[in-house]
Amino acid sequence: ENDWALKDAQGPRNEDMHYQECVQKQYRALRRKGCNTDIITMEHDLSDYKLLTVPMAYMFYHGYAEKLCTFAENGGTLVISYWSGLVDETDKCYLEGTPNGLMEAAGIRTEEIDALYDWEENHAIPEAGSHLGISNVYTCKNLCELVEVSDAEVLMRYGKDFYAGRPVLTHKAYGKGHVYYVCADMEQAFYEDFYGRT
């Protein structure tokens, strides 16, 4: 349903949002780390999981955000990516801000998204001294989201364009767990390193 809704969305890119690639990059990284990986629906029970990735989940059913918050509060690690929580199950936009229902848990709020041309790219530059210990610079393409940070830790920042210095990866301890927010379509190498450290 999320894929259908994305294909019907009018923007931010008129062609190919690269949703399947976003999911596949994370799946590949997790499998290469030896993690058993399930692809589940929004109705699925989350109690048996320690790590949950929510890649480009444009559509959030009513109540799904609360379920994700509870997962993190109870000790889970939640990884949310850009362009998530924009519409409900009837494809109506949430008006309270995005990612809907997760702004407090993630410690961020989406301001806008930049759709890059196919030949354009930006870079994700690590913050010195972040708890992840990532030191590489990574390429990001296609979609780059701009977020306002309320109380999240910034782990990486954009390297160029009008949003140079803005957050591209954030973290917030939430309850007994953790919430990470990935603001851009990152290259495969990023996910390999990131999931090796979370």
Where are these regions (language model features)?
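Carbohydrate-binding surfaces of carbohydrate-active enzymes
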Residues: 1-198
